[in-house]
A protein has these predicted regions:
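ABC family nucleotide-binding domain
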Residues: 1-178
């Protein structure tokens, strides 16, 4: 493709960039010379919503959201569950908190993935083609959640083929072609 997903993976340090730098929180980080400490600090302020949800199949929606808070952020379980329930409510999935991924539609699974991202209180959320794995009739529910986040001022870096959506909710649109 044109390098959209690779670009997202590079700004989240999931892949090594050949050159350039990232400006985050007013500070410039050269890709070729960034410390593990700086990467960890940036990741604490970001969240990633993957194309194929990346939910744990053996965990409920609630536990998919709490897992990273408890294990990764060392948050007490009761606090993690409070944050997870609030995030699930925000994306319209609180009533499905005890459902497993196989019991949810693709759109519902992606909304759980968005709740997982929101629960970390990120400054920016990276979205990698969040609707590409969805049936067309389910795309609207995910875009609706993202539209609401944009209205609330959430900073998002979105890789998408939904050009109308991108134009309507974005401050800036970058069209990538040929890497």
């Amino acid at each position: 493709g044109s390098g959209k997903t690779t670009m997202l993976r590079c700004v989240n340090f999931l892949e090594h960039a050949d050159g350039g730098s990232l400006i985050f929180d007013g500070k410039e980080y050269p890709f070729h010379n960034i410390s593990k400490k700086d990467i960890a600090a940036i990741r604490q302020k970001t969240a990633f919503v993957f194309q194929n949800y990346n939910l744990f199949l053996n965990k409920t929606a609630l536990h998919n959201v709490t897992e990273g808070l408890i294990i990764g952020r060392k948050m007490p379980k009761t606090r993690a569950e409070e944050k997870a329930r609030a995030a699930l409510e925000k994306v319209g999935m609180l009533d499905r908190a005890d459902y497993y991924p196989h019991q949810l539609s693709g759109g519902q699974q992606q909304r759980v993935a968005i709740a997982r991202a929101l629960a970390t209180d990120p400054e920016i959320i990276y979205f990698d083609e969040p609707t590409s794995a969805l049936d067309p009739e389910l795309t609207g529910e995910v875009l609706g959640v993202m539209r609401q986040l944009a209205k609330e001022g959430m900073t998002m870096l979105v890789v998408t083929h939904e050009m109308g959506f991108a134009r309507n909710v974005s401050n800036k649109v970058v069209f990538m072609e040929n890497g």
